[in-house]
Amino acid sequence: QSLYGNEPNQYLFTWRTGDNTLVLNDYSRAQRFAWYLWDQFGIGGTPYPFPYEGFQKIIDKYKGALPITIKAVPEGTSVKTSNVLITVENTDPEVPWLTNYLESILLQVWYPTTVGTLSREIKKLLVTYLKKTTSYDGDGVKNIVSFMLHDFGFRGVSSVESSAIGCSAHIVNFLGTDTVSGILLAQDYYNTDNMLAFSIPASEHSTITSWTEPFEVKAMENMLDQYPTGLVACVSDSFDII
């Protein structure tokens, strides 16, 4: 059971295909786009084999729903790399090309899978050494390890969407993140107000360097004055390690 339900890759279809149905404007635009590319390659004398009848059938017979069955490993499941993650089955032999239309969007699963796998391997390593070097066991290990790998990944990815997807995968394994977009994505999609991850007050380099180096200690004291109880995080390398 993962934090995000049991239906695989739901996020992709809700976000990218709306209500999962095809409307006339969708494939009319696709047809114009394809014809334009066809002409650019100098093949204008040959009719472009656009599957107009197939798309029309999907609209007429299936009310725009795609005759496709998609099966996948439930979210949050740990599987070997040789395991099939997704299968796409066409349920109407008259539109056999439809499966490949979904290939690229389905492959987006590689990114959260990679993030989730990496954070899980790090978590396993942390658990191993917590048990070897501390007196924690059972729930104690579980509670402390949940906050030992914090997600600051927003600045290291290509877009807001990427940050949200990556964070959603990370918080399957850990509860600490500063990537708010990922928490909001998971909350919105799975319709919950539960807080799925957490953070603490923290400084950044600008809030330390603005005090200037001679007053770095004052900057740290100010942090403690502002947050006299609980945990805070302070960057220690703005000038030098104190």
Regions found by a protein language model. Name each.
Residues 37-40, 53, 58-67, 76-242:
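Buried, small/hydrophobic-residue-enriched core segments of structured protein domains
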Residues 22, 68, 73-74:
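A structural connector/turn signal
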Residues 1-48:
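Low-complexity, highly charged intrinsically disordered N-terminal segments
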